[in-house]
């Protein structure tokens, strides 16, 4: 379950996460750490497709998006048990299948910390091209009924007036959550069909603005 979540400014909780790992002597693993390996030295196990420069780290060379590439990690966990703690910071928004990644996190760890750009960040025109959010992000997230909800980045967010309504309630640019045992997650719509585009778009904004 999600034990705590909040909107924060980017990186606010990093020291708290490191302190939590150190004080509890948790075995820990950082998934997708290479771009910003802030969890070192408290966390010395890394999964990513590029190695970290630190030489005292257990590194698994894994394409995070390819489930078949995770074999070495799964074998390690089978032999040594689940990690006490996992970190997945600014990675879930980049992958094509965040539900699969969430399943993997639960398979390899007992609990964890996830940081992702907030919906406010993804609706903000961040760069000179005036597009909303980061172009390489494939989806964004919010917490709905204590569940991590995945919202596809549909093209209509660029022009629909309701996108600016979301920004009127701006809180912070990062969504952070702590989970334990299970990580509840689902995709907006939950596989149910919508009758026409208007139904889909209205439901999308109603959920985000509620």
Language-model features, listed with the residues they occupy:
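Class I SAM-dependent methyltransferase Rossmann-like catalytic core
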Residues: 1-22
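S-adenosyl-L-methionine-dependent methyltransferase catalytic module, highlighting the catalytic core
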Residues: 99-210
């Amino acid at each position: 379950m999600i034990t705590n979540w909040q909107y924060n400014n980017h990186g606010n909780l990093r020291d708290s996460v490191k302190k939590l790992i150190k004080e509890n002597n948790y075995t820990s693993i950082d998934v997708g750490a290479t771009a910003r390996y802030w969890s070192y030295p408290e966390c010395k196990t890394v999964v990513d497709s590029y190695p970290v420069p630190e030489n005292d780290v257990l590194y698994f060379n894994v394409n995070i998006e390819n489930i078949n590439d995770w074999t070495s990690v799964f074998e390690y966990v089978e032999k040594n048990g689940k990690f006490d703690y996992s970190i997945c910071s600014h990675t879930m928004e980049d992958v094509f299948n965040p539900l699969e990644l969430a399943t993997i996190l639960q398979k390899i760890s007992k609990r964890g910390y996830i940081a992702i750009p907030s919906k406010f960040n993804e609706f903000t025109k961040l760069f000179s091209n005036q597009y909303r959010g980061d172009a390489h992000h494939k989806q964004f997230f919010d917490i709905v009924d204590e569940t991590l909800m995945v919202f596809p980045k549909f093209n209509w967010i660029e022009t629909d007036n309701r996108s600016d309504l979301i920004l009127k309630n701006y809180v912070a640019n990062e969504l952070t959550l702590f989970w334990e045992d299970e990580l509840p997650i689902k995709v907006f719509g939950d596989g149910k069909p919508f009758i026409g585009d208007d139904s889909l778009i209205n439901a999308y904004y109603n959920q985000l603005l509620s």
